Protein backbone atom coordinates (compact mmCIF):
# COMPACT_ATOMS: atom_id res chain seq x y z
CA UNK A 1 0.00 0.00 0.00
CA UNK A 2 1.23 3.49 -0.88
CA UNK A 3 -0.03 6.33 1.29
CA UNK A 4 0.34 9.89 0.03
CA UNK A 5 -0.74 12.06 2.92
CA UNK A 6 -1.37 15.81 2.77
CA UNK A 7 1.74 16.61 0.74
CA UNK A 8 2.94 19.97 -0.49
CA UNK A 9 5.41 20.09 -3.37
CA UNK A 10 7.11 23.14 -4.82
CA UNK A 11 9.26 23.77 -7.88
CA UNK A 12 11.09 26.99 -7.18
CA UNK A 13 8.38 29.38 -6.02
CA UNK A 14 5.64 27.47 -7.86
CA UNK A 15 3.37 25.24 -5.76
CA UNK A 16 2.63 22.04 -7.71
CA UNK A 17 0.74 20.11 -5.05
CA UNK A 18 -0.92 21.40 -1.88
CA UNK A 19 -2.60 19.29 0.81
CA UNK A 20 -2.74 16.45 -1.72
CA UNK A 21 -3.54 12.89 -0.63
CA UNK A 22 -4.11 9.51 -2.29
CA UNK A 23 -3.95 5.81 -1.47
CA UNK A 24 -2.68 3.27 -4.01
CA UNK A 25 -3.47 -0.36 -3.31
CA UNK A 26 -1.08 -3.22 -4.16
CA UNK A 27 -1.26 -4.80 -7.62
CA UNK A 28 -3.31 -1.97 -9.10
CA UNK A 29 -2.48 -0.35 -12.44
CA UNK A 30 -2.78 3.40 -12.03
CA UNK A 31 -2.74 6.06 -14.73
CA UNK A 32 -1.32 9.36 -13.46
CA UNK A 33 -2.73 12.17 -15.60
CA UNK A 34 -2.88 15.96 -15.68
CA UNK A 35 -1.80 18.95 -17.71
CA UNK A 36 1.85 19.39 -18.67
CA UNK A 37 3.78 20.91 -15.79
CA UNK A 38 1.25 19.93 -13.13
CA UNK A 39 3.72 17.72 -11.25
CA UNK A 40 3.41 14.18 -12.62
CA UNK A 41 7.14 13.56 -13.11
CA UNK A 42 7.81 15.39 -9.85
CA UNK A 43 5.54 12.92 -8.05
CA UNK A 44 7.53 10.07 -9.60
CA UNK A 45 10.72 11.63 -8.21
CA UNK A 46 9.08 11.77 -4.77
CA UNK A 47 8.05 8.11 -4.97
CA UNK A 48 11.67 7.25 -5.84
CA UNK A 49 12.82 9.29 -2.82
CA UNK A 50 14.77 11.67 -5.05
CA UNK A 51 12.87 14.79 -4.03
CA UNK A 52 11.87 16.12 -0.62
CA UNK A 53 8.47 17.41 0.45
CA UNK A 54 7.59 20.81 1.87
CA UNK A 55 5.07 19.05 4.10
CA UNK A 56 3.19 15.77 4.41
CA UNK A 57 4.45 12.24 3.90
CA UNK A 58 4.67 9.43 1.37
CA UNK A 59 4.76 5.91 2.81
CA UNK A 60 5.87 2.93 0.73
CA UNK A 61 6.57 -0.52 2.26
CA UNK A 62 10.27 -0.66 3.16
CA UNK A 63 10.81 -4.01 1.48
CA UNK A 64 9.39 -2.89 -1.87
CA UNK A 65 11.73 -2.77 -4.85
CA UNK A 66 11.07 0.12 -7.24
CA UNK A 67 11.88 0.08 -10.94
CA UNK A 68 11.63 2.94 -13.43
CA UNK A 69 12.80 3.95 -16.89
CA UNK A 70 16.21 5.62 -17.01
CA UNK A 71 16.25 8.80 -19.07
CA UNK A 72 19.74 8.37 -20.50
CA UNK A 73 21.28 5.46 -22.39
CA UNK A 74 25.03 5.84 -22.81
CA UNK A 75 26.53 4.70 -26.08
CA UNK A 76 28.55 1.70 -24.94
CA UNK A 77 30.39 -1.24 -26.43
CA UNK A 78 28.22 -3.36 -24.13
CA UNK A 79 25.70 -5.41 -26.09
CA UNK A 80 21.99 -4.68 -25.89
CA UNK A 81 21.39 -8.06 -24.22
CA UNK A 82 24.05 -7.51 -21.57
CA UNK A 83 22.79 -3.96 -20.96
CA UNK A 84 19.28 -5.26 -20.29
CA UNK A 85 20.51 -7.92 -17.87
CA UNK A 86 22.16 -5.11 -15.87
CA UNK A 87 18.61 -4.08 -14.99
CA UNK A 88 18.37 -7.06 -12.65
CA UNK A 89 20.69 -5.58 -10.04
CA UNK A 90 20.06 -8.43 -7.60
CA UNK A 91 21.33 -10.94 -10.16
CA UNK A 92 24.42 -8.82 -10.93
CA UNK A 93 25.18 -8.43 -7.21
CA UNK A 94 24.93 -12.18 -6.66
CA UNK A 95 27.24 -12.83 -9.61
CA UNK A 96 29.83 -10.52 -8.04
CA UNK A 97 29.40 -12.27 -4.68
CA UNK A 98 29.86 -15.63 -6.38
CA UNK A 99 33.04 -14.45 -8.07
CA UNK A 100 34.46 -13.28 -4.73
CA UNK A 101 33.33 -16.44 -2.93
CA UNK A 102 35.08 -18.70 -5.45
CA UNK A 103 38.40 -17.34 -4.19
CA UNK A 104 37.50 -18.06 -0.56
CA UNK A 105 37.07 -21.84 -0.87
CA UNK A 106 34.05 -21.51 1.44
CA UNK A 107 31.76 -24.34 0.37
CA UNK A 108 28.82 -23.23 2.51
CA UNK A 109 28.99 -19.68 1.16
CA UNK A 110 29.17 -20.92 -2.43
CA UNK A 111 26.16 -23.19 -1.88
CA UNK A 112 24.21 -20.31 -0.35
CA UNK A 113 24.95 -17.98 -3.26
CA UNK A 114 24.05 -20.65 -5.83
CA UNK A 115 20.75 -21.17 -4.02
CA UNK A 116 20.08 -17.42 -4.07
CA UNK A 117 20.93 -17.26 -7.77
CA UNK A 118 18.47 -20.03 -8.52
CA UNK A 119 15.79 -18.24 -6.49
CA UNK A 120 16.58 -15.02 -8.41
CA UNK A 121 15.96 -16.74 -11.74
CA UNK A 122 19.59 -16.70 -12.82
CA UNK A 123 19.19 -19.70 -15.10
CA UNK A 124 16.42 -18.06 -17.12
CA UNK A 125 17.63 -14.46 -17.13
CA UNK A 126 19.13 -14.61 -20.62
CA UNK A 127 15.96 -16.03 -22.16
CA UNK A 128 13.83 -13.50 -20.26
CA UNK A 129 16.00 -10.63 -21.48
CA UNK A 130 15.81 -11.93 -25.05
CA UNK A 131 12.01 -12.21 -24.81
CA UNK A 132 11.77 -8.57 -23.70
CA UNK A 133 14.01 -7.38 -26.52
CA UNK A 134 12.15 -9.40 -29.14
CA UNK A 135 8.84 -8.10 -27.79
CA UNK A 136 10.12 -4.54 -28.10
CA UNK A 137 11.02 -5.07 -31.73
CA UNK A 138 14.71 -6.00 -31.70
CA UNK A 139 15.92 -8.71 -34.06
CA UNK A 140 18.07 -11.68 -33.07
CA UNK A 141 21.07 -10.00 -34.67
CA UNK A 142 20.44 -6.63 -33.01
CA UNK A 143 20.34 -7.91 -29.44
CA UNK A 144 24.04 -8.74 -29.67
CA UNK A 145 25.02 -5.35 -31.11
CA UNK A 146 26.62 -2.61 -28.97
CA UNK A 147 24.20 -0.08 -27.49
CA UNK A 148 26.11 2.69 -29.25
CA UNK A 149 24.79 1.38 -32.58
CA UNK A 150 21.19 2.31 -31.75
CA UNK A 151 19.40 5.61 -32.30
CA UNK A 152 17.77 7.57 -29.48
CA UNK A 153 14.35 5.99 -29.95
CA UNK A 154 15.75 2.46 -29.86
CA UNK A 155 17.87 3.31 -26.83
CA UNK A 156 14.66 4.31 -25.05
CA UNK A 157 13.32 0.84 -25.85
CA UNK A 158 16.45 -0.59 -24.24
CA UNK A 159 15.78 1.45 -21.10
CA UNK A 160 12.18 0.24 -21.06
CA UNK A 161 13.34 -3.39 -21.28
CA UNK A 162 15.87 -2.73 -18.52
CA UNK A 163 13.07 -1.44 -16.26
CA UNK A 164 10.84 -4.42 -17.06
CA UNK A 165 13.45 -7.08 -16.32
CA UNK A 166 14.14 -5.66 -12.87
CA UNK A 167 12.19 -7.64 -10.23
CA UNK A 168 9.99 -4.98 -8.67
CA UNK A 169 7.04 -4.37 -6.40
CA UNK A 170 6.43 -0.89 -7.83
CA UNK A 171 6.96 -0.09 -11.51
CA UNK A 172 6.97 3.57 -12.58
CA UNK A 173 6.65 4.16 -16.32
CA UNK A 174 6.88 7.69 -17.73
CA UNK A 175 5.51 7.81 -21.31
CA UNK A 176 6.46 4.18 -22.07
CA UNK A 177 4.78 4.16 -25.50
CA UNK A 178 6.94 6.97 -26.91
CA UNK A 179 8.87 5.71 -29.97
CA UNK A 180 6.82 2.47 -30.07
CA UNK A 181 4.86 1.23 -33.09
CA UNK A 182 1.37 -0.24 -32.69
CA UNK A 183 2.46 -3.90 -32.58
CA UNK A 184 4.99 -3.13 -29.85
CA UNK A 185 2.42 -1.16 -27.85
CA UNK A 186 0.06 -4.16 -28.01
CA UNK A 187 2.88 -6.44 -26.82
CA UNK A 188 3.66 -4.04 -23.96
CA UNK A 189 0.00 -3.95 -22.92
CA UNK A 190 0.00 -7.73 -22.65
CA UNK A 191 3.18 -7.74 -20.59
CA UNK A 192 1.91 -5.09 -18.19
CA UNK A 193 -1.40 -6.88 -17.68
CA UNK A 194 0.59 -9.89 -16.46
CA UNK A 195 2.76 -7.79 -14.16
CA UNK A 196 2.01 -8.75 -10.55
CA UNK A 197 3.28 -5.62 -8.77
CA UNK A 198 1.86 -2.12 -8.47
CA UNK A 199 2.07 -0.11 -11.68
CA UNK A 200 1.89 3.67 -12.10
CA UNK A 201 1.95 5.08 -15.64
CA UNK A 202 2.28 8.60 -16.99
CA UNK A 203 0.97 8.63 -20.55
CA UNK A 204 -0.84 10.87 -23.02
CA UNK A 205 -1.98 7.77 -24.94
CA UNK A 206 -5.65 7.46 -23.96
CA UNK A 207 -6.13 4.10 -25.68
CA UNK A 208 -3.14 2.72 -23.80
CA UNK A 209 -4.51 3.98 -20.48
CA UNK A 210 -7.92 2.52 -21.35
CA UNK A 211 -6.44 -0.90 -22.04
CA UNK A 212 -4.13 -1.00 -19.01
CA UNK A 213 -5.42 1.00 -16.06
CA UNK A 214 -7.63 -0.17 -13.22
CA UNK A 215 -7.49 3.27 -11.57
CA UNK A 216 -6.79 6.89 -12.51
CA UNK A 217 -5.22 9.63 -10.39
CA UNK A 218 -5.68 13.09 -11.85
CA UNK A 219 -3.60 16.06 -10.73
CA UNK A 220 -5.88 19.09 -10.87
CA UNK A 221 -5.93 22.30 -8.86
CA UNK A 222 -2.86 21.05 -6.95
CA UNK A 223 -4.80 18.02 -5.65
CA UNK A 224 -4.69 14.27 -6.33
CA UNK A 225 -8.15 13.11 -7.43
CA UNK A 226 -8.65 9.34 -7.47
CA UNK A 227 -11.03 7.44 -9.76
CA UNK A 228 -11.78 3.73 -10.11
CA UNK A 229 -11.69 2.34 -13.64
CA UNK A 230 -9.83 3.11 -16.84
CA UNK A 231 -9.50 6.42 -18.67
CA UNK A 232 -12.95 6.26 -20.29
CA UNK A 233 -14.54 5.57 -16.90
CA UNK A 234 -12.64 8.54 -15.49
CA UNK A 235 -13.95 10.85 -18.22
CA UNK A 236 -17.55 9.79 -17.57
CA UNK A 237 -17.28 10.07 -13.79
CA UNK A 238 -15.51 13.43 -13.99
CA UNK A 239 -18.15 14.79 -16.39
CA UNK A 240 -20.90 13.67 -13.99
CA UNK A 241 -19.08 15.22 -11.03
CA UNK A 242 -18.62 18.52 -12.86
CA UNK A 243 -22.29 18.56 -13.91
CA UNK A 244 -23.36 18.04 -10.28
CA UNK A 245 -21.02 20.80 -9.11
CA UNK A 246 -22.38 23.15 -11.78
CA UNK A 247 -25.99 22.33 -10.83
CA UNK A 248 -25.20 22.96 -7.15
CA UNK A 249 -23.53 26.27 -8.01
CA UNK A 250 -26.52 27.40 -10.08
CA UNK A 251 -28.90 26.41 -7.28
CA UNK A 252 -26.88 28.44 -4.79
CA UNK A 253 -26.84 31.43 -7.14
CA UNK A 254 -30.63 31.24 -7.57
CA UNK A 255 -31.10 31.12 -3.82
CA UNK A 256 -28.86 34.17 -3.40
CA UNK A 257 -30.79 36.05 -6.09
CA UNK A 258 -34.11 35.33 -4.34
CA UNK A 259 -32.71 36.65 -1.06
CA UNK A 260 -31.76 40.01 -2.55
Region annotations inferred by a language model:
Residues 1-251:
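ABC ATP-binding cassette signature C-motif
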Residues 250-260:
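Short cytosolic helices in intracellular loops of multi-pass membrane proteins
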Amino acid sequence: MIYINNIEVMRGTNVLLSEASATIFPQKRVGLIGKNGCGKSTLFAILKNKLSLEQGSVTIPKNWLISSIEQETPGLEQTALDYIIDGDTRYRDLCKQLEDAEHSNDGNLLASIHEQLEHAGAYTIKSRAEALLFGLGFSKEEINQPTKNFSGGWRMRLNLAKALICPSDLLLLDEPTNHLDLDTVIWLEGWLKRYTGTLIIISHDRDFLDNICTHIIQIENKKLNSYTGNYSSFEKERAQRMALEQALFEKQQNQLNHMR
